[in-house]
């Protein structure tokens, strides 16, 4: 059985990147929550 995490920079950016977050209402809420918390990095 192979490991579940097979790193890929492209997939990481597409799924968890800033533009992916901005594309949906839920993603915008995630960013807003992270801004409110004062996170240094908002997204991948």
UniProtKB/Swiss-Prot annotation:
Keywords in alphabetical order: Ribonucleoprotein, Ribosomal protein
Gene designation per UniProt: rpmH
GO biological process, one term: translation
GO cellular component: ribonucleoprotein complex; ribosome
GO terms assigned for molecular function: structural constituent of ribosome
Similarity comment text for this entry: Belongs to the bacterial ribosomal protein bL34 family.
Keyword DNA repair: no
Recorded superkingdom: Bacteria
Organism lineage string: Bacteria, Pseudomonadati, Pseudomonadota, Alphaproteobacteria, Hyphomicrobiales
Name this polypeptide is given: Large ribosomal subunit protein bL34
UniProt keyword Transmembrane present: no
Disulfide-linked positions: none
Species of provenance: Beijerinckia indica subsp. indica (strain ATCC 9039 / DSM 1715 / NCIMB 8712)
